[in-house]
């Protein structure tokens, strides 16, 4: 169909240059992060009435917000209200559980600088009140996960503070920790290890 102007001339649509979509490099399909895997695991435990464990929210003080559109708000500036303690907490078989999740690309050790003093103090307090505190450590290059009781983390932290090494060797983690199995549902079955280590 030909379209014409009132003066009879033909309308020629201005040819617009063909835009090739810019490919965005995404790494989302390379694998889930440890946090995502644990969140999925905890969702599985909750929906199957196995345990009630949640990720703790990070307490933030929002200072500046921009509104580029009416329905969108973009936080431009925020500060931590207080130091966060550990990543996850909840209840399993009537016991309070509290744990931190850490990843490392190191092959032979886990650096203690990944912990902060307030996290160590928090784990000590959990243990003092008969709670269960532990750390899940992932060696990403080997795709291996270990559950390590907080008493060992505290001992290694104290060793560091008395002039000892500033990391935990992988051999020490293998010796004192428990290897976690990964699957489909749940993704990281840490409850099975809790049953063996704390409830047997």
Swiss-Prot record:
UniProt-annotated stretches for the region Disordered: 1-25
Binding locations of Mg(2+): 85, 87, 100, 119
Statement: the UniProt record of this protein carries the keyword Nucleotidyltransferase: no
Major localization listed first in the record, in broad terms: cytoplasm
One Pfam match: RecU
Superkingdom of source: Bacteria
Catalyzed reaction equations: Endonucleolytic cleavage at a junction such as a reciprocal single-stranded crossover between two homologous DNA duplexes (Holliday junction)
Broadest EC class assigned to this enzyme: hydrolase
Database matches in Gene3D superfamilies: 3.40.1350.10
Subcellular location: Cytoplasm
A GO cellular component annotation in the UniProt record: cytoplasm
Any one of the GO BP annotations: DNA repair
EC number: 3.1.21.10
Keyword Cytoplasm: yes
GO molecular function, one term: magnesium ion binding
Entry keywords, A to Z: Cytoplasm, DNA damage, DNA recombination, DNA repair, Endonuclease, Hydrolase, Magnesium, Metal-binding, Nuclease
Cofactor mode of binding and number, as noted: Binds 1 Mg(2+) ion per subunit.
Site feature: Transition state stabilizer: 102
Cofactor: Mg(2+)
Entry's family note: Belongs to the RecU family.
Xref: HAMAP family: RecU
Described purpose of this protein according to its UniProt entry: Endonuclease that resolves Holliday junction intermediates in genetic recombination. Cleaves mobile four-strand junctions by introducing symmetrical nicks in paired strands. Promotes annealing of linear ssDNA with homologous dsDNA. Required for DNA repair, homologous recombination and chromosome segregation.
Name of the featured protein: Holliday junction resolvase RecU
Native source species: Bacillus thuringiensis (strain Al Hakam)
